[in-house]
């Protein structure tokens, strides 16, 4: 058998063992089956198996212990690889997406990196989607999960297998991937400051009551810590397609006097509250929040825009560090300052 075929066989066996590690068949700290048993399980010779185990040991996925066999290891470190291509998983239906991917692709083109876009998976889990790219030897991936649940244990295994991961708008990847997010606390503080400059001392807040929405929960927390909210409207995330009607019904039936300003959590909440206030003939109420919503300019809203240029730059920097300094790398949350626009 030629050297190339040998190498391919060793790699195939290595991948079979990696899959069992990813699926949790072989757990961290557990001993692998004895060589004879494992060779029979994988239908390969013991000589082939030993070479494949050597590849895994070099990667840190198994630890050879004299007299006690091979134990599974899950190192949490970066992996040197080619950055000629980076995978981006993101929700295409989000209007903010077009601005995000445009900035992402432009930065990639300027730095000789191709961007392979994949829509946020609908049927398979996020981890399984990432694993498919691992199988295709694409080891650098940026994930914007939005409301997609993340299996932290599987992220841990993916990191050990060699995936370099950066997450946008969430901290769900910590400590197995970096996070690049808007500086939500600062953004809310800036909005409150601009509202106060207009002589307004009372403001309400509209956000989401459920869903794994990292940014939404941080923004509500920042509002509470700053000075609270005269009214707090939480729309159910699972009914977000009805957000306009829900916001209208809530504000129409509220017993308290509406405050002179409303802070919204994101563009969807901004659109919902803007529509509700128009129907209630309360367009005198100032709107302020994160990201533009349709009609923000006409409503003279105060908007904190996310800085796409610096956000994407930081994401690429995170990927670079994971590749170039794998042993020193530790996952961090990078907060990017937004830009205030007053229409």
Predicted regions located by residue number:
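Flexible loop/turn connectors
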Residues: 16, 252-343
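Amphipathic helical "hinge" segments at domain boundaries
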Residues: 11-12, 23, 76-139
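N-terminal helix-turn-helix/winged-helix DNA-binding helices
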Residues: 5-6, 30, 64-93
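An alpha-beta-alpha
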Residues: 190-231, 328-343
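Extreme N-terminal segment that seeds HTH/winged-HTH DNA-binding domains in transcriptional regulators
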Residues: 1-41, 124, 132
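N-terminal helix-turn-helix
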Residues: 28-64
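Hydrophobic alpha-helical segments within soluble ligand-binding/sensing domains
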Residues: 176-205, 243-249, 305-326
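Flexible loop/hinge segments that line or gate small-molecule binding clefts
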Residues: 147-187, 291-301
């Amino acid at each position: 058998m030629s050297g190339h075929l040998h190498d391919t066989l060793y790699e195939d066996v290595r991948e079979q063992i990696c899959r069992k590690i990813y699926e949790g068949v072989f757990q961290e700290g557990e001993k692998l089956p004895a060589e004879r048993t494992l060779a029979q399980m994988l239908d390969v010779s013991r000589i082939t198996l030993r070479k494949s185990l050597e590849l895994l040991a070099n990667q840190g996925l198994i630890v050879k212990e004299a007299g006690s066999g091979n134990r599974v290891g899950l190192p949490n470190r970066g992996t040197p690889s080619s950055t000629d291509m980076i995978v981006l998983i993101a929700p295409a239906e989000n209007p903010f997406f077009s601005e995000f991917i445009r900035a992402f692709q432009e930065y990639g083109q300027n730095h000789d990196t191709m961007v392979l876009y994949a829509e946020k998976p609908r049927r398979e889990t996020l981890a399984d989607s990432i694993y498919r790219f691992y199988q295709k030897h694409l080891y650098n991936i940026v994930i914007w999960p939005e409301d997609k649940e993340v299996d932290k244990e599987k992220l841990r295994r993916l990191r050990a297998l060699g995936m370099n991961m950066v997450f946008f708008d969430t901290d769900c990847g910590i400590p197995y991937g970096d996070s690049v997010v808007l500086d939500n606390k600062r953004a809310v503080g800036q909005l409150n400051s601009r509202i106060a400059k207009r002589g307004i001392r009372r403001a309400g807040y509209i956000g989401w009551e459920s869903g794994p929405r990292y940014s939404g929960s941080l923004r509500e927390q920042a509002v509470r810590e700053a000075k609270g909210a005269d009214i707090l409207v939480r729309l159910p995330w699972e009914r977000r397609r009805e957000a306009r009607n829900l916001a209208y019904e809530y504000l129409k039936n509220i017993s308290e006097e509406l405050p002179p300003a409303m802070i919204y959590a994101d563009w969807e909440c901004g659109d919902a509250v803007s529509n509700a206030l128009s129907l209630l003939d309360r367009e005198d109420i100032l709107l302020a929040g994160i990201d533009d919503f349709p009609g923000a300019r006409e409503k003279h809203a105060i908007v904190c825009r996310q800085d796409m240029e610096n956000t994407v730059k930081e994401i690429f920097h995170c990927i670079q560090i994971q590749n170039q300094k794998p042993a020193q790398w530790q996952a961090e949350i990078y907060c990017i300052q937004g830009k205030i626009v007053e229409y």
